[in-house]
Design a protein with these regions (language model features):
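Short glycine/proline- and aromatic-enriched beta-strand/turn motifs that initiate or cap beta-hairpins
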Residues: 19-64, 189-191
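Outer-membrane beta-barrel transmembrane domain signature
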Residues: 60-70, 76-191
Length: 191
């Protein structure tokens, strides 16, 4: 129930922000940096893979005053994933999420020293893994697709934002043999 209320509150905020602004009044922000992710099978507490990579997170927000905004963020990334059995794979992720930003870099007019944000959406964290069966393509997609949520903080570093966040791709319980993915990001922002 809390998740539903949170999603409705976020949707209401986005609607309120867009109602008072036209699409031309939005602001673009970008962040790029390091992404560490682990696959986590909650039924067995196994860790099927770990990944190191880079993420680019563009966002388009509508200001609500000088210290708050609502909008959309679409992080994409690429990394090298290593499975628990020693195999190295290509990992990649993509997400589309609603976002609520407060404080630093929530708007271009903000002069706060620190800030925070919450993202809620849908996306996928996938790996191209070697097909050892011998039939079909040499590599197959092993994806963890589901609801994405992320929380983070940011602070000012020499005039630009530095973001530290934790995210989760939560796969449905009906997705057998698919792991949830926990991601830690350190991103450098600019606009």
């Amino acid at each position: 129930m809390k998740k539903l209320l949170s999603a409705l509150a976020l949707a209401a905020g986005v609607h309120a922000a867009s109602a008072q602004n036209s699409i031309k009044d939005g602001e673009w922000f970008h962040a790029v940096g390091y992404d560490y992710a682990i696959g986590l099978d909650l039924s067995t507490l196994a860790m099927p893979f770990a990944s190191n990579g880079v993420t680019w997170a563009p966002r388009y927000t509508f200001p609500v005053g000088d210290e708050m905004s609502f909008g959309v963020v679409a992080p994409v990334g690429l990394g090298i994933a290593q499975s628990q059995f020693g195999g190295i794979n290509l990992g990649y992720h993509y997400t589309l999420a609603a976002t609520m930003q407060v404080g630093l870099a929530s708007t271009q007019a903000s002069n706060a020293f620190i800030g925070a944000f919450v993202n809620l959406g849908y996306g996928s964290y996938a790996r191209q893994v070697r097909n050892n069966i011998g039939i079909g393509p040499a590599f197959v997609r092993d994806g963890s697709t589901g609801v994405f949520s992320e929380v983070g903080v940011r602070y000012d570093y020499m005039g630009n934002e530095v973001n530290l966040s934790a995210g989760l791709w939560r796969v449905p319980t009906s997705a057998v043999d698919k792991a949830d993915v926990v991601s830690l990001r350190l991103l450098y922002g600019f606009w």
